[in-house]
Amino acid sequence: MEGNKLEEQDSSPPQSTPGLMKGNKREEQGLGPEPAAPQQPTAEEEALIEFHRSYRELFEFFCNNTTIHGAIRLVCSQHNRMKTAFWAVLWLCTFGMMYWQFGLLFGEYFSYPVSLNINLNSDKLVFPAVTICTLNPYRYPEIKEELEELDRITEQTLFDLYKYSSFTTLVAGSRSRRDLRGTLPHPLQRLRVPPPPHGARRARSVASSLRDNNPQVDWKDWKIGFQLCNQNKSDCFYQTYSSGVDAVREWYRFHYINILSRLPETLPSLEEDTLGNFIFACRFNQVSCNQANYSHFHHPMYGNCYTFNDKNNSNLWMSSMPGINNGLSLMLRAEQNDFIPLLSTVTGARVMVHGQDEPAFMDDGGFNLRPGVETSISMRKETLDRLGGDYGDCTKNGSDVPVENLYPSKYTQQVCIHSCFQESMIKECGCAYIFYPRPQNVEYCDYRKHSSWGYCYYKLQVDFSSDHLGCFTKCRKPCSVTSYQLSAGYSRWPSVTSQEWVFQMLSRQNNYTVNNKRNGVAKVNIFFKELNYKTNSESPSVTMVTLLSNLGSQWSLWFGSSVLSVVEMAELVFDLLVIMFLMLLRRFRSRYWSPGRGGRGAQEVASTLASSPPSHFCPHPMSLSLSQPGPAPSPALTAPPPAYATLGPRPSPGGSAGASSSTCPLGGP
């Protein structure tokens, strides 16, 4: 009976234990002493996810199946170590060169280079705004007495320094010149300075070159300037100039600004001024101008100014034809009656071309017109569109610039710079500079109210020029700019043969007699040279499409592969990480099942089995060996079979006939 049971056990198919790694699957042979039939191999069960059991197997599989050129040579030449080493070094060098090129391409992309695209367009053009000034600072009736007093003090100063006197306003009599000079703060002085450190020969050449303008000053020892101090007189300096002309003009300008600051906001004298006092004739596209085509304002240094075709014009001028006859033509009065000779030393007019929504900065962009000359100014329009963001530091409308726009116009870099200086002036000096707009509730600078504003202003001007105020850094360039490239031509006007009838007609038409014929008039023509205008636009030099194309070209150059090869490389890296993780997991588990802890582990297993209820089935010795850490058992069992007699039923201690127990070995055979 027992023999029959043993034969049934031998004829049962062996159990198999699947492993964790690929290729780790085993088949157990029958344990019977004499198998009745050959053992049939059991089909391996394929797992959903299988991994290679070693790095060597992984690299061999990759090199045999990848589409990357040269990788298969590492496997095909494995029996020749020299070839294997050669191809390995070549493959690694090629791989390194490719990724070096990749680094250059990514570096170029993240530097955000731009390309300049130039397009030539042709269409009807909006005529720009034109501002023209008289170059004649105005003597306001409201401050006439103060200006006359300043003229008398200036003449006395020139007489004391240069022995020069030509004005008819000089006051002689009981009031001495010294008393007259003492009535004005910050007097102009002649200051002794040490000789220059370089040789006397160089000093003599400098002195001789400057002595013509200032005959009373020895330039080895003297300079002209005026003293400025802070509020408590603890710090003072001299604002000096090497030229007496520059010193007198700047000193006069400084006092003139203080007088202008006392004017009220609105002046009736400015409203009474009309265009006919300055412009004899005005035509655009052969049509006469009218009062609705211009606006008037006053500049402290350039006098009365008129802006044609500005944003206040309801119908902006359009140019549909180029040429001198299809633009703006003006006949100007260039005489300077009732002018301020110490403030303005030139005659003629000053003109500037700008956009409709831009203020006219006559100091920055204007140029002068000569009397007795016809000036023809041809224009060519250009637009520039910059890229913002990572590609360039520009602003669209100035809303992201930390400077308040004090001008009633759109954002430009000049508007921002002047507003920034005015903000610094108000913050440091406590008053506003009269040449720039001011915020509400802020007064213009006047040494009667702000005694040290001149000291603060000239110090601030030095910091502004050296960009210590940060205005040039804060004020970014606008992303969209429209400019006009100007070129001027000059001709004598009127000619000798035509000047008689021209002056006669001008005098009768305007009820004005030209005293000095040629020096009293000027003419200017402003027109488009051509209707073709150039558009300069920036575009990214390296886009994402260009970057991917360059990367693909480099990959094909060094490996002759495609984008699927990149996926293969990603799969290789993923498999490497998985194998590394599994090896670390094995090492982590082996720390708790190390040989030094084997006795303790066996005791724990024995106690667990002893405390468990009896079972009718015994685990296979191979499964027990696999459940314990250590080297995997051999697929073929060479040890003798266990004692089968011990597997028979034994009577229970209680003598129960139906109960049976079995004794199972914990280890292998």
From Swiss-Prot:
Residue ranges, annotated region (Gating release of inhibition by proteolysis (GRIP)): 175-243
Effect of residue 394 to S: Increased channel activity
GO MF annotations in UniProt: ligand-gated sodium channel activity; WW domain binding
Tissue note: Expressed in the female reproductive tract, from the fimbrial end of the fallopian tube to the endometrium (at protein level). Expressed in kidney (at protein level). In the respiratory tract, expressed in the bronchial epithelium (at protein level). Highly expressed in lung. Detected at intermediate levels in pancreas and liver, and at low levels in heart and placenta. in skin, expressed in keratinocytes, melanocytes and Merkel cells of the epidermal sub-layers, stratum basale, stratum spinosum and stratum granulosum (at protein level).
Effect of residue 181 to W: Significant increase of amiloride-sensitive sodium currents
InterPro entries xref list: ENaC, ENaC_chordates, ENaC_CS
Regulation: Originally identified and characterized by its inhibition by the diuretic drug amiloride. Inhibited by phenamil.
Impact when changing residue 327 to C: In PHA1B1; results in a significant reduction of channel function as compared to wild-type; significantly lowers both Li+ and Na+ ion currents
Biased composition (Low complexity): 33-42
This protein's record includes keyword Membrane: yes
Keyword Magnesium on entry: no
Extracellular side stretches: 107-562
Subunit architecture: Heterotrimer; containing an alpha/SCNN1A, a beta/SCNN1B and a gamma/SCNN1G subunit. Interacts with WWP1 (via WW domains). Interacts with WWP2 (via WW domains); inhibits the channel. Interacts with BPIFA1; the interaction is indirect via SCNN1B and inhibits the proteolytic processing of SCNN1A and SCNN1G and the activation of ENaC. Interacts with the full-length immature form of PCSK9 (pro-PCSK9); inhibits ENaC by promoting its proteasomal degradation.
Stated family: Belongs to the amiloride-sensitive sodium channel (TC 1.A.6) family. SCNN1A subfamily.
Protein's name in the database: Epithelial sodium channel subunit alpha
Biological classification of the source: Eukaryota, Metazoa, Chordata, Craniata, Vertebrata
Gene that this polypeptide is encoded by: SCNN1A
